[in-house]
Amino acid sequence: MPVKSDRWIRRMALEHGMIEPFVDHQVRKGVISYGLTSYGYDMRVTNHFKVFTNVYNALVDPKKFDPRSFVDIEADYVDIPPNSFALAQSLEYFRIPRTVSCIVIGKSSYARCGIIINVTPLEPEWEGHVTIEISNTTPLPARIYAHEGIGQVLFLESDEPCEVSYADKKGKYQGQTGIVLPRIDP
């Protein structure tokens, strides 16, 4: 599965709407970088965040997740409490081709400050805004900036189409917009 280049990413974004909105160069001055890179795309985070809090002394259970465990924040930045996390969404909407799977890795500017992101793979024919988990591994509050880079998407193309894509199996996060909490199929 070779990683795809900037030329391929640009063509797929402009001709097939793979990334919208699409920035065809890397923006770096005065911000956490975002936009097209040599072999990836640095996606941005919106100004909508859900910051984890344990106000109700809830158990964190992915099968019975209590949405009251989060505080909704809309701002130009968010400060994540020490040893806690927040959920956010990508500014970009992605449409992944059937022969492609994507891995998202964190930005070094954040990682060097103890801020780690986690995103599950973007599967073939998945589309939507990416829900991003942002962990503050430090004993101090950590700041995340809206409308700036949060993670790099790497596009890996297979030599043949998959038998069953995310769209084929009607994945539970297909077409998601906003910050989507855990879902369990009934």
UniProtKB/Swiss-Prot annotation:
This is dCTP deaminase. InterPro entries: dCTP_deaminase, dUTPase-like_sf, dUTPase_trimeric. Catalyzes the deamination of dCTP to dUTP. Its EC number is 3.5.4.13. Pathway: Pyrimidine metabolism; dUMP biosynthesis; dUMP from dCTP (dUTP route): step 1/2. One of its GO terms (biological process) is dUMP biosynthetic process. Belongs to the dCTP deaminase family. It is an enzyme of class 3 (hydrolase). GO terms for molecular function: dCTP deaminase activity; nucleotide binding. Homotrimer. HAMAP family: dCTP_deaminase. NCBIfam families: dCTP_deam (TIGR02274). The active site is at 133 (proton donor/acceptor). DCTP binds at residues 107-112, 152, 166, 176. The gene is dcd. PANTHER family: DCTP DEAMINASE. It catalyses: dCTP + H2O + H(+) = dUTP + NH4(+). Keywords: Hydrolase, Nucleotide metabolism, Nucleotide-binding. It holds the Pfam family DCD.
